[in-house]
Amino acid sequence: MRSFIKSHRKSNSLESDSDIDFKQLKRKNASTSQLSPPRYNTDYYDPVTSSPKTPTHSHTTSDSLPQKHSPGFESLHRLFNNKLFKKASNSSLNSYLANTDSQSRRSSKDQDPLAPSFHVLKTSSNPASQDSELPVIKGVITHTWGNHSKHNDPHVIVLNDPKTSFETLRSSDLEPPPRLTSKTTRSSVSSERSWSTRDHSMSPPLTSINQDIDIPEDMATRSKNTLINKKKMENRQARIHSNDDLIAMRKNSSDTLPQTAEFFASDKLPGDSTPILEIPESPPPVITLEKYNSSLSDAKELSRSKNVRSNRTSVVSMTQSEESRWSNHLMVNSNHNQNKLRDSDDSDYSNAIDEEDDDDADDDDEASQFSFEYSNLSGRTPSVKYYSKPEPKQMVYIDDLYDDEDFDEDMNYYDENEVSEFLQEEMASNKNNINTDTSVLKDLSSPSINDHSNEKPIYKPTIQMRVNKPKVHRYNDLFALSDEDDPSFNDDDEFDEDEEEGGDDNDEEDEIDEEYDQKVSDECGQSIELQSDDIHSDYGVEYYNDFGGDLNLQNDVQKHHINKEQQYISDEEFDDAITDFNMAKHIIEEEVVLDKAEALRYQKDAEPVQSKTSEDVVNYVDEDSNLRINEKLEKGDVTYQKPTLLTEVKNKQFQKKPVASFADIFNLESDSEEDINNEDGLTGLSDVGLDEDDAVSSPILQSPFESQSLAEGLVSPVICTPGKPNIINKQIIPTIKCEPSSPQEKTIENNKSHTASNFKEYGLNHPLPPPARSQALKFHDLNSELDSELPALMSNLYFIDETEEDAYNELNDVTRDEDEYLDEINTVPEDFNFSDTENDNNAAKRMLRRSNKGSFRSTYSFTDKPQGVTTESSPIKNKLEVNNKTVTFFSSPGWSKSPGSEIGMQRSKSPVKPSSGYRPFGQGSKQFPITPSHEPNYSIEEDRIASTDEILESRTPPTTYMAPSPAFIPNYSLSPIQEASSSVTNSPKR
């Protein structure tokens, strides 16, 4: 009841307001009709606003009726089912319909049109009609429909048009309002004008001030139904445009910019419900080029200042001064140059706006995307916003580094190029120290007769000595460094301290060094630069003779012939310097290598040196061998040959061959074999003409210090004698007996016969050894995470083609044990015949039915009519009972089935070896032959013979299962293999 009272009061207030508004409208219409003749229908405006309603399908009348409409008033009719105001509303509406119809017919004859595209009707000024109450439709600011353009431009819907708050809209522009009752006919108070308030932007420009436009009579008498249908078609083709679209349409449309700008002008006063169109009495002034440019720049600044995104629903408005400019510009016929300039500026501005829109669109596309989740029940579910994921970064695997870089066993990096360069530099420096001059050899071999023996040898640290300082080749070497050892910190500081503290001492030392170098260079041809004690004593052996062996030269003799008055170093350093001097002598001796045949000739004079223990004990011979070498060097029978690097020999001798087939794997050596060869110094002996039996190894390679010195990169050079066989001096270079490091070959025995292969020397052509399981890799042996789990290089893994492997096995008669077993226990054998159980005798089946009838009924099967007696609840003992176990049925091997025999197969509980010969199967049964299955050799020929006698053979070993026995004839199916005894929790009875 409260809602009824409120709505009734609201409707009364609406009626009172409509009476006041209509009286004001009558006074204004009367005054305007008396003042001016009916020329412009724009003088007449409706004081009410309306909103578009749902279109109706009734076309009974040519006019539409505005009715009292408010939310409360309409809700009352819906609430009380048209019982409250039915009589009053019908009487008032019916009385009003007759008046409005007659008035509209009279006024249609006296109308004056404004434009050919508008059909305008004047309102009659009859006092009787003016005194009658007119129902009012109240509304809010609504959207206005655009006019149909002659140039087929898209229809425009202006959002929240400010004109609608002050101007009234015609009902013809909108859809006819719905009738309040089902019996009333539709009419409209605002039918006096049908197309008067079209958009000014779409109307043609006014060419003159007081020009009357005549319209044909057929347009005046056009029926309302045609207009409504046309309006419907236009509304269906309409589109809602934003502020950006309207700006772009203004620039691209054929209409001028001032025409569309007038459409957005909203400078009407709020209290004035009837805006007055001011018509200038004098001709408008001509707009100059400067004035036009200023107005255009103002418009650009105004439009650019607006935010495009935040003002999607706003309407571009112009100031009053700008509107006056554009309205004046409508009356001006500007020259052709001004039009061109205006078009060019407009096109540039529109292009700039389009580019901004495109950039915004691109940003929106790249920012995010939307997708929808679809469910089975309710179709599309709420949308899910997801962002574009960046491309994943390329992963770096360890094997990629292995291909290009070098790592040792401890994953420490080392570069072979740096090591080889270091060795080459050391080799070049030591090569310069070696001189074939006999005087030098005599001086080194017999220091007692040396002219310069009385002088103290002084060893100065040179640049090469600094190279010998420990370099960082491994990751662990970083922790061995310190600020004292680092040359970058230590050398400069010490040099500065020495200059500050004792500059005189340094000058004296430099003078002594220069004198010593001059004397040695004059006598030997080149200066011998040795390594000082302070470098090699802390970091181990640097030269390859620093192994601490007996040098056969007494240090006391050296000390006796040296003048100690010139000593400026301590006794310990002096002793170490003498040791280094003796090592320099053996540099030349150990570089000279003679041929093997000549070595046997000199072997009579000296005792051959061999290793008698497991450790490589090196013993040196007397000094007579040194004299023999000196004699050959004096005669010129011996020429020096450049020593070769170990790295070069490694690349030639132990270069990994590419694996092209399955057989190439067995030609490769393991890493341990290569390490043994490298440690024993046997690498590259074939290049110098030596065998492994007489392997020559330098003692520098078996140094207990395990130094990575220059000697590890050198192979003893060969001294060639012209016209004589090469000579090896075993008195100087000791020999070490060692066994060949290659693994011995193993013979391959066949099932029937196989000839044992003889042992051959390493490196010769020999048949390939049998494949080892550790070397033969298959695809299923490879793990998916090899990059992080394998410690060795990826190049050691080879993907073997199984066809090549099979061909190799057939060629070498290599049997594969895995072929004799099933691949999987749950796989049915390939030779299994599924029709074996169907060919059994019918008598066995009938016996099965008779014996299992009672137990079959106990498994809750109602094939027969149940009896009222107690039955056993447990199944028969031959029933299959499993508990999550998988059972494979297959025919047992080692027995034959003759035609017409009635046999079954029993479940094997334990593997029993059947004996050869015949075995009886129960009472009255026949005897069947059993294939001997305990023989050690299981050949293929026996299988072929057995197949002719219908012997059922499987791929499993025949010693696994026992021969069948017909003890349980009802169990005629194949024998099951059960993994273990299980309970009956999951038995078939449940």
Swiss-Prot record:
- Composition bias (Polar residues) maps to 122-132, 308-321, 924-936, 972-990
Main location per UniProt? cytoplasm
Does Lyase appear among the keywords? no
Comp. bias (Basic residues)? 1-11
User: What family is this?
Assistant: Belongs to the ZRG8 family.
Q: Where is the composition biased (Acidic residues)?
A: 345-366, 482-516
Natural source organism: Candida glabrata (strain ATCC 2001 / BCRC 20586 / JCM 3761 / NBRC 0622 / NRRL Y-65 / CBS 138) (Yeast)
Can you list the disulfide-bonded cysteine pairs?
Answer: none
Q: Where is the composition biased (Basic and acidic residues)?
A: 103-112
For this record, the Gene Ontology CC terms, alphabetical, are:
cellular bud neck; cellular bud tip; cytoplasm; fungal biofilm matrix
Q: Which domain of life is it from?
A: Eukaryota
| Function of the protein | Involved in maintenance of polarized growth and daughter-cell-specific transcription.
Subcellular locations according to the entry:
Cytoplasm; Bud; Bud neck; Bud tip
In its UniProt entry, what is this protein called? Zinc-regulated protein 8
Q: Compositional bias (Low complexity) spans?
A: 49-64, 180-194
- Keywords of this protein's UniProt record, alphabetized? Cytoplasm, Zinc
Q: Which residue ranges does the record annotate as region Disordered?
A: 1-73, 97-134, 168-211, 297-366, 480-520, 856-876, 893-937, 955-990
